[in-house]
Amino acid sequence: MGEIMRKESEKPVISVIMPAYQAAQYIGQAIESVQSQTCGQAWELLVIDDCSTDGTMEAVRRYASDPRIHYIRQRKNRGVAAARNLGIKKAQGAYLAFLDADDWWDADKLRLQMEWIKRTGAVLCCTGRELMQPDGTPQGRVIGVPQSITYRMLLRTNVIPCGSVLLRADAAREFGFVCDRYHEDYILWLRILKKYGAAVGVNVPALKCRQSAGGKSRNKWKSAVMQYGSYRYLGYGRLRALYYMMFYTLHGVWKYFGASGGRQK
């Protein structure tokens, strides 16, 4: 496992974990959105390169002068769950955030979330998201989040985008991400909410989510199979899993036709 740009700096309060694979084209925008945060808290960014071959390392090197940015390269491709788990292991912050290398944040994202976590005592906080075209232009679709998200609510469908999350590091370490055969982030959120109580949602589209045709969340059949597998992994029987799949399907229809901006393109 290769590691570069690991420098001493102020101990961070927030560790941002950014898995990256073949991300040279977009990762600069993602990194700069972390650098632009107005939260007033010390942070570190851990870029976990999952054995890219497209120049991702060189793209990250452009930010080598920032001691808060750390680059770790895996020797073989192990998938996004393993990359995030490595980031969790290396993180020094009391709070963790996740950001994919092709997405980006509004500048106030972490500030708003820290305010809500301090106000409510929640272990996990998420935000809404705005869907973007591959070239970074808006699709005209914003997907919000409820102010409070309980375990039972989340069982019906995943309303917590991974790139919008800020959570306590100890809770993430307690469970970690499971393998990529399932919705690994969804399983983690459910485990955390079951033990620690409801998540808090900040209904602001602070996550800008770049949509690609080959993305896991865009392949509806594959996503549905993974959703069912997630229920089974959590110990639910076939009938109970199918019961929750009904809500998952209905929510998918609502997202397709009912979210801000109309039908998905």
Residue positions per predicted region:
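Short, acidic, metal-binding catalytic loop of nucleotide-sugar glycosyltransferases
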Residues: 32-42
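Conserved nucleotide-sugar donor-binding catalytic segment
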Residues: 144-223, 230
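Short aromatic/hydrophobic "clamp" motif used to bind/position activated sugar donors
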Residues: 96
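Glycine-rich, basic loop-to-helix element that forms the pyrophosphate-binding segment
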Residues: 74-91, 112
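N-proximal low-complexity "stem/linker" segments adjacent to membrane-targeting elements
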Residues: 1-33
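Conserved donor NDP-sugar-binding/catalytic core segment of glycosyltransferases
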Residues: 108-139
